Amino acid sequence: MQDTQAFLNHVHVQLQDLRDNGLYKTERVITTPQGAHVRTTDGREVINLCANNYLGLAAHPQVVAAAQRSLESHGFGLSSVRFICGTQDLHKTLEQRIARFLGLEDAILYAAAFDANGVLFEPLLGEGDAVVSDTLNHASIIDGIRLCKARRYRYAHDDMADLDRQLELARAEGARHVMVFTDGVFSMDGTVARLDEMRALCDRHGALLAVDECHATGFMGATGRGTHEHRGLLDDGRSRVDIITGTFGKALGGASGGFTAGPREVIELLRQRSRPYLFSNTLAPAIVGASIAVLDLLEESTALRDRLHANTRWFRAAMAGVGFEIKPGDHPIVPVMVYDAVQAQRLAARLLELGVYVVGFFYPVVPKGQARVRVQVSAAHSHEDLVRAVAAFAQAGRELGLLPADAS
């Protein structure tokens, strides 16, 4: 009992340290479906500018109806892992559909996108191999690389010259197989990876190219296939990226679940060796059925994608017009740079009072001195929503001294 109390005291100290340093995270509870507008528990309706609901599909009537149909036809859950009795026809259909959508041969589903990255490397790469990773890659990628025995190399963020050097080093040190892994879109900056240049470097050094497309699938590229389409690496429907990981928890409906798509042999080896696939319950039928409906919508029309990008262009221009510094780009992730952590939190808090829901990010989520409010634009936002949001930003910016007093 004394040991238990000592441990709990230790945990308490860590929690208090998080609070003292302004790093303690609280959950703001909403009482409505996810959408352009949400209601908080105090009854306020606010414009939601912090969801990954890029295409507005989280509560789309056709997606919800598909989930309900799948619930009725295939049940609530499977109570099994895939290789025992947890594979339904819906699962195989979704795997085939997402692979085809991305231009790859096959795909494997996971209960979470974190798993798709977390278990990719260990089954595929051994002690004689190497993995080369962007320094700003997502935590799931970092954790996955730590689990494997391959040699690890890191290149400076989005630095192609450094990537070239690390690939040369990996080859010079005798790596058998080399995999380069990057986020397609980096979630804190909205930076889009230069996959075309990376493909050329990988070809020069005989390396595989793998990409996490969680913040791209469904809306990046002319038909929403992702960053590889955006960068010209989708030829006649065939991907020139070797392996793609992604999620159904963002643009593709916003529920949960992840996937890895790639060559048929790679996917088959993952089915045999990836531990979450072998030891975790299968993805629920309602999510699978709804995700198939999402792909139906995206293959029928680019209207949602087009609306998202129109909203993004307008919002970026309007925010720059009132005087805010935003990270350049064309992605619906719009970092509004504040630099000071306290000011970022104050700005987010004041915006909530003004009816706009955003979140301030600061160290250790972003580097010290790089605090920002991250805005995520959606196809579900009306033009009026965005006009109101920019006006609220301008008012809060003036009040906090982030903008000149006469900023409009």
Label every model-predicted segment.
Residues N53, Y153, H157-V211:
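Active-site phosphate-binding strand-loop segment of PLP-dependent enzymes
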Residues L252-M319, F324-K327:
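PLP-dependent aminotransferase class I/II
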Residues D306-G355, V365, G369-Q370, V377-A379, ...:
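Conserved PLP-binding catalytic core of the aspartate aminotransferase-like
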Residues T223, E229, D236-L269:
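Active-site PLP attachment segment
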Residues L120-A139:
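Conserved PLP-anchoring active-site segment centered on the Schiff-base-forming lysine
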